[in-house]
Amino acid sequence: MVEALLSGIVLGLIPITLLGLFVTAYLQYRRGDQLDL
């Protein structure tokens, strides 16, 4: 039961973490592109 709960939490956090990293990288890219006039 505990293993299933942990696996569910991990599987739920992985996409959120990847999405957060992607959004952060995108925002930094946009900010750098705007500052590089």
Swiss-Prot record:
<keyword id="KW-0249">Electron transport</keyword>
<protein>
    <recommendedName>
        <fullName>Cytochrome b6-f complex subunit 5</fullName>
    </recommendedName>
</protein>
<keyword id="KW-1133">Transmembrane helix</keyword>
<comment type="function">
    <text>Component of the cytochrome b6-f complex, which mediates electron transfer between photosystem II (PSII) and photosystem I (PSI), cyclic electron flow around PSI, and state transitions. PetG is required for either the stability or assembly of the cytochrome b6-f complex.</text>
</comment>
<keyword id="KW-0934">Plastid</keyword>
<keyword id="KW-0602">Photosynthesis</keyword>
<keyword id="KW-0793">Thylakoid</keyword>
<keyword id="KW-0150">Chloroplast</keyword>
<dbReference type="Pfam" id="PF02529">
    <property type="entry name" value="PetG"/>
</dbReference>
<dbReference type="InterPro" id="IPR003683">
    <property type="entry name" value="Cyt_6/f_cplx_su5"/>
</dbReference>
<dbReference type="InterPro" id="IPR036099">
    <property type="entry name" value="Cyt_6/f_cplx_su5_sf"/>
</dbReference>
<feature type="transmembrane region" description="Helical">
    <location>
        <begin position="5"/>
        <end position="25"/>
    </location>
</feature>
<dbReference type="GO" id="GO:0045158">
    <property type="term" value="F:electron transporter, transferring electrons within cytochrome b6/f complex of photosystem II activity"/>
</dbReference>
<comment type="similarity">
    <text>Belongs to the PetG family.</text>
</comment>
<keyword id="KW-0812">Transmembrane</keyword>
<dbReference type="GO" id="GO:0009535">
    <property type="term" value="C:chloroplast thylakoid membrane"/>
</dbReference>
<keyword id="KW-0472">Membrane</keyword>
<comment type="subunit">
    <text>The 4 large subunits of the cytochrome b6-f complex are cytochrome b6, subunit IV (17 kDa polypeptide, PetD), cytochrome f and the Rieske protein, while the 4 small subunits are PetG, PetL, PetM and PetN. The complex functions as a dimer.</text>
</comment>
<dbReference type="GO" id="GO:0009512">
    <property type="term" value="C:cytochrome b6f complex"/>
</dbReference>
<dbReference type="GO" id="GO:0015979">
    <property type="term" value="P:photosynthesis"/>
</dbReference>
<dbReference type="GO" id="GO:0017004">
    <property type="term" value="P:cytochrome complex assembly"/>
</dbReference>
<keyword id="KW-0813">Transport</keyword>
